[in-house]
Amino acid sequence: MSRKEELYDITIIGGGPTGLFAAFYGGMRQAKVKIIESMPQLGGQLAALYPEKYIYDVAGFPKVKAQDLVNDLKRQAEQFNPTIALEQSVQNVTKETDDTFTIKTDKETHYSKAIIITAGAGAFQPRRLEVEGAKQYEGKNLQYFVNDLNAYAGKNVLISGGGDSAVDWALMLEPVAKNVTLIHRRDKFRAHEHSVELLQKSSVNILTPFAISELSGDGEKIHHVTIQEVKGDAVETLDVDEVIVNFGFVSSLGPIKGWGLEIEKNSIVVNTKMETNIPGIYAAGDICTYPGKVKLIATGFGEAPTAVNNAKAFIDPTARVFPGHSTSLF
């Protein structure tokens, strides 16, 4: 295949909600679109971190399960058959003399007339449990993500953490698991006030201020967890079937920092057209920043069409930035 045949109109780096909607909108603008995603699946953090959790602040949905939203976004984008490249991490972007871009991943090289970066918070990794022997149980019955609530049915579950995810998982697992214990190293939870209120009214066993001090198991599964009172002498040993740790996540822009883009506080600076400082490269969603920026899925859904429409005009100066409403296009 020649480079000309491989040349896409718009390449979207990041296959989360904003990237998926950008792919749909790019297709609607009759652009040849490709998505490059570093994860094994599309959906970004919604699919990777909390597919079973409900989202309440997407317009038109009183509530929607994260994975269901991802599935709908995929179906919407698939109407225009975008090319999908999964498990590829973009390492470098080069602007060529003909104003097109060469995009090198850890697996292959891609070519595009314009780029939209929708990489969310960048690459993210969970903050891990720093207790002796923890690593050997990761992916067995020590988890940092909950992908399937039913996997915890009838089990004794210990959750460690004090933020939104830890509290939300405790509440969601309460009716599924045999029992749920939530420990936090501080007396006060950092989660949303309403969630904490629901937690206090639930049957979840709350132990504060405690932290995990020891794991006991057979190398395949943890059977007992010892917890130590923080700044105290109390010690308890709990029987467990599953352990979920949520201490938050560490995100990084990684190679993006080396692409020559203007970066501010780990975000890509854009103007009202979603243009970066490099003509032909746009950014949308949580990865970008501008005065008054609010990082919400709903915001990304508005920024994606802005980025696509301006990318279309960049590729084809005769194209209208605003194409009209979808009701007149289908």
Swiss-Prot record:
SUPFAM superfamilies: FAD/NAD(P)-binding domain. It comes from the Bacteria. It catalyses: 2 reduced [2Fe-2S]-[ferredoxin] + NADP(+) + H(+) = 2 oxidized [2Fe-2S]-[ferredoxin] + NADPH. Belongs to the ferredoxin--NADP reductase type 2 family. Binds 1 FAD per subunit. Its EC number is 1.18.1.2. It comes from Halalkalibacterium halodurans (strain ATCC BAA-125 / DSM 18197 / FERM 7344 / JCM 9153 / C-125). FAD binds at T18, E37, Q45, Y50, V90, F124, D286, T327. Homodimer. Keywords: FAD, Flavoprotein, NADP, Oxidoreductase. This is Ferredoxin--NADP reductase. Gene3D superfamilies: FAD/NAD(P)-binding domain. Its cofactor is FAD. InterPro entries: FAD/NAD-bd_sf, FAD/NAD-binding_dom, Fd--NADP_Rdtase_type_2, Ferredoxin-NADP_redctase_2. GO terms for molecular function: ferredoxin-NADP+ reductase activity; flavin adenine dinucleotide binding; NADP binding. PANTHER family: THIOREDOXIN REDUCTASE 1-RELATED-RELATED.
